[in-house]
């Protein structure tokens, strides 16, 4: 790679890529809230607009496992969700962290080229992904659709992906709060939880027509049943529909994550160049935030997708069956693994199922905790947040750890950061497992990603003085 500047290859494309100009002055917090709301509204509208030209299908969704974490909605303009942005960002984070590409983030020109390269790669990924979706028959047999409709579908998907990329850039450049990726994922999850709690629609699961929303059903049962005790028991324990026990579990997981967000180790630091009061460098328990569970979910989802596709093509192959055997569940069109490696990577659907197969439950718990800890400890090395990277930042900013020699900063940070990263990753995994086993209204991964994102917005508001930071 010596002498080769990968980023320079991107320069010719710069004039042709749409870009959000950075604000010339600081954007007021109220305006940031407004732009964030506008961005969110556009995302929600796009999630409800169906793709023009598709043949509706009730077949099992091979991408079912990825939709939640990628803010994707099947058959809509948000079919690709944030997949191109996330994939491009992680690839370039890996390339930059491992120094496979030469980039100096201290130089404005390099930062701009790096961002342009990410955007270009995201557009290329969206084009490739859209083409694969159409040609593999996700929206109907290509021969039946015709060349014109196939091209139109690809155009819609790529254009929608470009809009999402620009919405994310709008927030990242300082017009809004946080990032589009976190906002869209959290919104998708919160929308799912809200619907399961308050849905006014009625369904029949063999017990007569019932309200789908847990709270709506609870109120309805209290007002229509003479035996209030039985009404409450039914509202908390009803099967195949959201119930109040799941809602209470969801609230408890939310509270636990928010509580654990406050756990941190404060390292006292001071300037090595001038006298002054001590500051602190906080190392949070969730040092890598929700990234470990996001990566674990991505790994699991991709294995599920590959396993399901292979099983459909080669259902009798021994190696394919070892990876996973798939079958439907009663009352559901979606396929689920019933044996093989994929089966042990899938969380039990409830506590009853977990107790019925304790071997699977133990393997699943060990898998999630172990993978989250490894991902968390590994990510700090390639994301610029390792002890060596932080010690380098201290040196550049003229900071030293109070009561320690300047040269011992790395040793002190190495003692704390990797432990916090690994333990924090395992804790995130444990919360996710608890949520899955106790049967919350969303997956453990989804709830954790939503809470950490919402808490991040709370911290932004506290920093601006809009809420009490001590809450």
UniProtKB/Swiss-Prot annotation:
The chain crosses the membrane at residues 34-54, 77-97, 120-140, 147-167, 247-267, 362-382, 416-434, 441-458. GO terms for biological process: misfolded protein transport; post-translational protein targeting to membrane, translocation; retrograde protein transport, ER to cytosol; SRP-dependent cotranslational protein targeting to membrane, translocation. It is found in: Endoplasmic reticulum membrane. SUPFAM superfamilies: Preprotein translocase SecY subunit. One of its GO terms (molecular function) is peptide transmembrane transporter activity. Residues 1-33, 98-119, 168-246, 383-415, 459-471 are cytoplasmic. The keyword Zinc-finger does not apply. This is Protein transport protein SEC61 subunit alpha. It comes from the Eukaryota. It is a multi-pass membrane protein. Its main location: endoplasmic reticulum. The gene is SEC61. The keyword Disulfide bond does not apply. Belongs to the SecY/SEC61-alpha family.
